[in-house]
A protein has these predicted regions:
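Rossmann-like NAD(P)(H) cofactor-binding subdomain of soluble oxidoreductases
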Residues: 1-68, 86
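Generic structural signal for well-ordered, non-membrane alpha-helical segments
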Residues: 6, 31, 35, 39, ...
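General beta-strand structural signal in soluble alpha/beta enzymes
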Residues: 25, 51-57, 97-101, 160, ...
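Internal alpha-helical scaffold of NAD(P)-dependent oxidoreductase catalytic cores
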Residues: 8, 16, 41, 45-52, ...
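Alpha-helical transmembrane segments of multi-pass membrane proteins, especially transporters
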Residues: 55, 134, 138, 162, ...
Length: 254
């Protein structure tokens, strides 16, 4: 379900929703006008602040799951018993499921890794090399961690399946839609042309619009991810973005 349609869709079905029915979210994004994740979107339109909720995330391409290739994911819920129940429901010989109570960390990592994947694709499209790719992704991981922890996430979540695991998959594998968008941007294509030619959604494009607002709200410096947002908004070209990033003040690594 696309984030921009989620509230209206949930309102349309609210009278049919059992207040004890758990929602399992696979969405990885943010609602642009509110900066909310799915766990905070759902309660209002369904009219139940205590609607049971679980988020399922981690490094997983659907085609590989369908082909029964080994996969590991994480389910996060503030209700530990619910998380365990979903774990038992979904686990199989080909799918390992870990549990977490850090809903914020899992959701924020899942949303922002899509923006970082666009950045990784841009580096690939511009043929900037492996050194640049490694530095950019490392910096992007730090930016996601800085923001997520400011929002209440656990640092360990960002190094787990929903953080580092999903980031590696999305940034480095050709099946990634967001990486593909970045690769084509880095190769010189215009965003409108790219989006018009795709028959699937690249959530990182819309999520990028929330990055600058989040960075300002939580007072976090996020030069890589905000550069992607500015490229998406046609405020910056990929070439100028690289020059800006390389000319940032030399700092101590944190």
């Amino acid at each position: 379900m696309l984030f921009r349609f989620s509230s209206s869709f949930l309102e349309s079905i609210s009278t049919h929703v059992d207040p004890k029915l758990p929602f399992i979210s696979l969405s990885k994004g943010l609602e642009l006008n509110t900066l909310r994740t799915m766990s905070t979107i759902i309660p209002r339109p369904v009219g139940n602040r205590r609607q049971p909720f679980v988020v399922l995330s981690g490094p997983s391409f659907a085609v590989e799951l369908m082909n029964k290739l080994p996969t590991a994911m994480v389910v996060a819920s503030k209700d530990n018993k619910l998380a365990s129940s979903v774990q038992q429901l979904l686990a199989s010989p080909n799918l390992r499921i870990s549990t977490s109570s850090d809903v914020t960390g899992v959701e924020i990592a899942g949303a922002l890794k899509n923006v970082l994947a666009i950045a990784a694709g841009i580096v690939e499209g511009m043929s900037l090399g492996n050194n640049c790719m490694a530095a950019l992704v490392a910096q992007g991981c730090s930016e996601i961690r800085w923001l997520a922890t400011k929002m209440g996430a656990k640092p360990t979540t960002l190094s787990g399946l929903s953080g580092s695991g999903d980031i590696m998959l999305t940034c480095f594998v050709n099946l990634s839609r967001n990486r593909t968008v970045g690769l084509r941007l880095g190769s010189g294509e215009k965003l409108d042309r790219i989006m018009g030619s795709m028959n699937q959604v690249a959530e990182g494009v819309s999520t990028a619009g929330a990055v600058i607002a989040l960075a300002q709200k939580y007072k976090v410096k996020m030069p890589v991810l905000t550069a992607v947002a500015r490229i998406i908004d046609n405020e910056l070209t990929p070439t100028k973005a690289v020059l800006e990033l390389m000319n940032l003040p030399q700092v101590e690594e944190v």
